[in-house]
Swiss-Prot record:
UniProt-annotated binding residues for L-serine: 235-237, 289, 388
Subcellular locations according to the entry: Cytoplasm
PANTHER family the UniProt entry points to: SERINE--TRNA LIGASE, SERYL-TRNA SYNTHETASE
Keyword Metal-binding: no
Chief subcellular location: cytoplasm
List of residues binding ATP: 266-268, 353-356
Protein name: Serine--tRNA ligase
Aminoacyl-tRNA synthetase among keywords: yes
Organism of derivation: Burkholderia cenocepacia (strain HI2424)
Gene Ontology molecular-function annotations: ATP binding; serine-tRNA ligase activity
Physiological role: Catalyzes the attachment of serine to tRNA(Ser). Is also able to aminoacylate tRNA(Sec) with serine, to form the misacylated tRNA L-seryl-tRNA(Sec), which will be further converted into selenocysteinyl-tRNA(Sec).
InterPro entries: aa-tRNA-synt_IIb, aa-tRNA-synth_II, aa-tRNA-synth_II/BPL/LPL, Ser-tRNA-ligase_type_1, Ser-tRNA-synth_1_N, SerRS_1_N_sf, SerRS_core, tRNA-bd_arm
Gene Ontology cellular-component terms listed: cytoplasm
A Pfam cross-reference name: Seryl_tRNA_N
Amino acid sequence: MLDIQLLRKDLDGVAKRLADRGYTLDVAAFSALEAERRAIQTHTEELQARRNSLSKQIGAMKGKGEDTSAVMAEVGGIGDDMKASEAKLGEIQARLSDLMLGMPNVAHESVPVGKDEADNVEARRWGTPRQFDFEVKDHVDVGTPLGLDFETGAKLAGARFTMLRGPIARLHRALAQFMIDTHTQQHGYTETYTPYIVNPEILYGTGQLPKFADDMFRVEKGGAENTVTQYLISTSEISLTNTVRESIVDASALPIKLTAHSPCFRSEAGSYGRDTRGMIRQHQFDKVEMVQVVAPETSYAALDEMVGHAEAILQKLGLPYRVITLCTGDMGFSAAKTFDLEVWLPAQNTYREISSCSNTEAFQARRMQARFRNAQGKPELVHTLNGSGLAVGRTLVAVLENYQNADGSVTVPEVLRPYMGGMERIDAPAQAS
């Protein structure tokens, strides 16, 4: 959530910055609500001052033995007026809060201004795409003989679900273990196991609600009269970041660096017809997430560090990639700045997103009321960052395509072999004669 004081000080400036993000701020509606809020607040304060004055007058009159009934009646009337004004003020503030909850973060000044992904800026590349001396297959054709089973996944749960069997399932698990081990043993993160179902207020904290309710899977428990609504997480960023919700941490505890391997659940509303083949866009997929909670002055150094941590995974796997700076119009709702990592997929002859690393500055912290004690001992909002390290399913796709062989086998990347019992290659099972 944006700081409402920022809008009060420079409403037109904030509106311009939000317009760069493709969001139209209703300046007239905000101004009208603010004017009404100020008027009611001023009236309430005047009533409070009048009641305080009359209360002192009543005390003085009682000391003199004078009749206070008329003054007390006026005090009673003021009390009724104050209750009505406070109720109205609460209503106005709730409407302002609803308006604020729907506003995206403002972009950092270093973010390129643009409308969509066509205006993103490539920062750098690593690795050289492999030159194949045979016809390249996509991950579906490579993986299906090795245990990638879309038919059973669809039978069990419908479209955009996948079943993994045998060595492919083991390779998928190996990738996640390798990522977690790298982040905990080399990058300083604490491994965390989180709930996969969370309460609605948790999603408000990280910005998925109210705007992206249609993208979430909702679950309900209890009978018809006692239904409790919860949500399946779309990323473990949600639960990891909210661990500091409604708390004040000591500055000495920062940075807090957490990582988790979890399934992620997304309805993919609005993506009908996109990436319908294979594992690129799924309703359920695994991801290793990185989250950092830091002091404001260190958050952009932390963002660069986090991008480096995601890059390290790709480099160790030997997968070519590029780093993209997202423009204002392509960033996620909560982000102030985002870098995407895109891995090379030879069958598509292009780079595809495999990680997104973002600094949300104080946007999520303000929604969560997550603070730390600064050098002056005063509570101050932390900055929160999140990044994929990496999306496990898409990494599996990249390994299958980049490490495929002419005979249909897949070479296991060296760093994964300890997790695969020393296996160097995945071969299709022999066909019964």
